Amino acid sequence: QEFSDLLLAKRGEGVEVNLIYDSFGSLATPREFFQRLKDGGVNVLEFNPVDPIQAGRRWSINHRDHRKLLLIDGRVAILGSINLYDNSSSGSQAPPRTRAGRLEPAPGWRETNIMIEGPAVAGFQQLFLDTWTRQKGPALNRGSGYFPVLGPRGHDIVLALGSNADSRDHLIYITLVSAIKSAEAYVHLTNAY
């Protein structure tokens, strides 16, 4: 509720708000949640609808969008593992909840997210727009605000890589292996699967 309220408030201020959600991953989310956003002027796109008739001939239950990506004004990208539901957004130190009259510990999950600023944000912006286009989302106002000119930030090298069900090049895997092979002091890796 708090998240949708914030999106609607920003939309009310004239901010363009576009949301892609995975159909299968959001089965437990009430349809009213997305309808309320649509009614408030948010552009909402269902990724690969679970209904094969609605999805069309290329439907596959395993063709999912697992990205968690927040883009702000083409200048900031926040990405990682957090989802928009209680277990994920509550954190691992969440207070107990009451269920069926009993006090139970909240099953919070450990999540990792990063914030990126600088030219690499354009790569993440392009990944979002490519997905929007492939999923046949409504036309967006693709003004210059999507890709502002950004100067370098920091000293790290950041590259936006994406994959989808049609990818056959294993670019993410190849890049991870290459990065690990080039390590000289340490490797830190977090991956859920």
Q: Which residues fall in each region the model found?
A:
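Charged, low-complexity intrinsically disordered terminal segments
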Residues: Q1-Y193
